[in-house]
């Protein structure tokens, strides 16, 4: 038995497995997704990153045939989502917010049910269930009913259920929401292994660390519109700015520091808990010296400072807060 999909639907690593072109979806006068396009490749994790209400789940529902596409087109391993929905459903897995496992059944019973729905032969079904239970370390709780599971155990079962038919494409809709850090990290490891074995993974998330760690490519969306796309490194480089972090000694200093810094570098943010200023700079060395001069002139007592490269957090906040496109 193997974790690879049947040869007739297999996609070579690096080739496009999911293609979305100019997708649009509205609910009455509310536009949920506008002219959205991206590709996801076999053997990679494509992260769809955005705040709550950005259109991530709506996009996933359209790609997995759960919602009709208003306009635009999408294909999954060459199958047209709108014209061939039954065929598409046979080659995808879906886990996350809309997982369909039955809380009154055990993990084994749920997986047996899914295997029968996919018409997997009995012997192969038994082997596959045993393999997945072992691989995802579910042996200790596989015979308990699902409603007794912890959040991490439930999420693990959701992912395993989506893999029962060895799909070449896996959609994960915010799969780690509500998990504790340890369970989240364990699930990240499993998702990474799936991609390494050739699965195309489309992951929606609002966790920046998750997108940064897991995703080979990232699409940032806000209000249903693509704001930026590329690798994490490309997005950080394209932001074309450094961040100057300055720690001050008191709240009084912080207030004066914000006012003074804005004269040199607009867009200053502050953290009263850490007595920290974060100042975006387009000319790091020159502007950082200018900031220190104006802070000194304003009588601000500085305890520490550093100039750093932007993080994915900086990219995300810039693009979703200002409405800017890159």
Where on the chain are the PLM-derived regions?
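ABC-family P-loop ATPase nucleotide-binding domain
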Residues: 1-24, 322-326
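C-terminal coupling/interaction segments
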Residues: 2-4, 283-326
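Conserved protein kinase catalytic domain
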Residues: 89, 133, 160, 236, ...
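A generic structural signal for secondary-structure junctions
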Residues: 93, 119, 146, 237-240, ...
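ABC transporter nucleotide-binding domains
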Residues: 15-20, 25-223, 227-228
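ABC transporter nucleotide-binding domain
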Residues: 189-282
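Preference for bulky hydrophobic residues occupying beta-strand positions
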Residues: 25, 38, 246-248, 279, ...
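A short linear hydrophobic-aromatic micro-motif
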Residues: 137-138, 265-270, 301-306
């Amino acid at each position: 038995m193997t974790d690879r999909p049947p040869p007739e639907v297999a996609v070579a690593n690096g080739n496009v497995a999911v293609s979305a072109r100019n997708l649009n979806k509205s609910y009455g006068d509310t536009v949920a997704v506008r002219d959205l396009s991206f590709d996801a490749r076999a053997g990679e994790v494509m992260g769809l990153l955005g705040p709550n209400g950005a259109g991530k789940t709506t996009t996933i529902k359209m790609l997995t045939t759960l919602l009709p596409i208003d306009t635009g087109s999408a294909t999954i391993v060459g199958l047209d989502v709108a014209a061939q929905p039954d065929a598409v459903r046979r080659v995808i897995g879906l886990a996350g917010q809309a997982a369909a496992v039955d809380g009154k059944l055990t993990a084994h019973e749920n997986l047996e049910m899914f295997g029968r729905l996919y018409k997997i032969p009995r012997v192969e079904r038994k082997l596959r269930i045993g393999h997945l239970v072992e691989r995802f370390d579910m042996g200790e709780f596989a015979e308990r009913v699902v409603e007794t599971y912890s959040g991490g155990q439930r999420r693990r079962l959701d992912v395993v259920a989506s893999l029962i038919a060895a799909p070449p494409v896996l959609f994960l809709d915010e799969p780690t929401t509500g998990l504790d850090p340890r369970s989240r990290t364990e699930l990240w490891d499993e998702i990474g292994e799936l991609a390494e074995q050739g699965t195309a993974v489309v992951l929606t998330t609002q966790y920046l660390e998750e997108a940064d760690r897991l995703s080979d490519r990232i699409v940032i969306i806000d209000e249903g519109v693509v704001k930026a796309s590329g690798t994490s490194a490309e997005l950080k480089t394209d932001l074309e700015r450094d961040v100057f972090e300055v720690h001050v000694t008191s709240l009084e200093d912080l207030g004066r520091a914000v006012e003074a810094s804005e004269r040199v570098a607009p867009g200053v943010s502050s953290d009263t808990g850490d007595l920290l200023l974060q100042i975006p700079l387009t000319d790091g060395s020159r502007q950082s010296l200018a900031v220190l001069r104006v802070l000194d002139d304003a009588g601000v007592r500085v305890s520490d400072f550093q100039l750093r490269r932007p993080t994915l957090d900086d990219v995300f906040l810039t693009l979703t807060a200002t409405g800017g496109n890159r």
